[in-house]
C-alpha cells in the first residue's frame, strides 16, 4: 500500500522546521516493521508530499501508533496542515478484496 499525504506549511512556521519535521516523520515510519520506504518531496516551497510504502496493517489507520510515531505526527502538525491524505491499494490486494464480494 502507498500512504500519500500533502502538508502545507503554516505561515508562522519556517521551511527549515517543516523539512526537519518531515524528515523525522519519514525516519520514524522507516523504523517500523512492514514499512518498506518513506520519502518526502517539495512540490513547491510551502508544500511537502510524503509517500510511505508499507504492508497492509503496518502503517496508517490500521496500525496502532507508538509514542514516537505520535510525536512525529504532532511535530509535523505543528509545522503544517495536512491538506490531503490517501491510501492507495495495489492491484493484487484490490482484486483479492473485490473477489470477496463475489
Language model features: what each stretch is:
Residues 27-37, 52-88:
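An amphipathic, aromatic/His-enriched active-site/gating alpha helix that lines ligand/cofactor pockets
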